[in-house]
Design a protein with these regions (language model features):
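Class I SAM-dependent transferase core
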Residues: 2-75, 105, 111-120, 227
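Short loop/edge segments at beta-strand edges and connector loops
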Residues: 20, 46, 125-127, 197-199
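Conserved SAM/SAH cofactor-binding pocket of Class I
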Residues: 60-150, 156-157
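Helix-to-beta-strand junctions that scaffold the AdoMet/dcAdoMet cofactor pocket
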Residues: 92, 163-165
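Short alpha-helix immediately C-terminal to the canonical SAM-binding loop
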Residues: 106-108, 177, 181
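Short "lid" loop at the C-terminus of a central beta-strand within the Rossmann-like core
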Residues: 129, 174-178, 202
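Conserved beta-strand signature within the Rossmann-like core of class I S-adenosyl-L-methionine
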Residues: 166-176
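SAM/dcSAM-binding transferase cores
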Residues: 182-237
Length: 237
């Protein structure tokens, strides 16, 4: 289904080498995504070349800015169809990835992909604000990822509680405004985070992306994350 040369080229542009085994995993993923998307909505992007660039290459761009040690623990918050968590795992099967989502059908899709490609992953059917207070998951991860449309202060409150001190929150968006980043500064202070790097790049021509890396420098106070309604209605800051 996928164009092998296009995946190799776009991955190489992100500093990632895709071997034949990895290509097979991505091809299976794309096929399952295409077929499952006919039954319920996982993505608006279904053309193979667009999927390669706008989903796979976009997620692989994380490797340009983050050095994942072997066996690093990562939680993908609001994973949906597996972006970016499943893409990262397909490229780096040594990672220990937990897929968090509140929608069972999406997690069932993730499980089907993992089964087909022969990789292990951890499925967590929960709301982020509930799992973030659970001792099994709170401050247990080296990395948290989110590729979402929520505002940065909201994403920080959902994601930072999962990260252990010294770990990082990787926030991916098509664009953060400088105002949005400034508005998150209070949330970072409260939650124990600090901006480590702000990376803006062109995925392809006229498609600008931004990856913000937030370092966890202190423990998150036990009162956070708050209930979802409070997070949305009154973002920190």
């Amino acid at each position: 289904m996928l164009n092998r040369d296009l995946l190799y080229k776009t991955a190489e542009n992100m500093g990632v080498k895709i071997d034949d085994d990895a290509f097979k995993r991505f091809d299976i993923y794309a096929e399952l995504l295409f077929e499952t998307n006919k039954k319920f909505n996982l993505t608006a992007i279904t053309e193979p070349d667009d999927m390669t660039v706008k989903h796979f290459a976009d997620c692989l761009s994380v490797f340009k800015y983050v050095d994942f040690k072997e066996g690093a623990r990562l939680i993908d918050v609001g994973t949906g169809a597996g972006f970016p968590g499943l893409v990262l795992l397909l490229a780096r099967p040594d990672l220990d990835v937990t897929f968090l989502d509140g929608t069972g059908k999406k997690l069932a899709f993730i499980e089907s992909v993992l089964s087909k490609v022969g990789l292990n992953g951890n499925i967590l059917h929960s709301r982020a604000e509930e799992a973030g207070k659970d001792p099994l998951y709170r401050e247990k991860f080296d990395f948290a990822t989110a590729r979402a449309v929520a505002s940065l202060p909201v994403l920080c409150e959902y994601c930072i509680p999962f990260i252990k001190k010294g770990g990082s929150f990787i926030s991916m968006k098509s664009a953060f405004s400088d105002d949005e980043i400034f508005s998150a500064s209070a949330a970072l202070r409260i939650l124990g985070g600090k901006t480590e790097s702000d990376n803006v790049f062109d995925l392809v021509e006229n498609t600008r992306r931004r990856i913000l890396i937030i370092k966890k420098i202190s423990q998150t106070p036990s009162k956070y994350p708050r209930a979802s309604a409070k997070i949305s209605k009154n973002p920190l800051g």
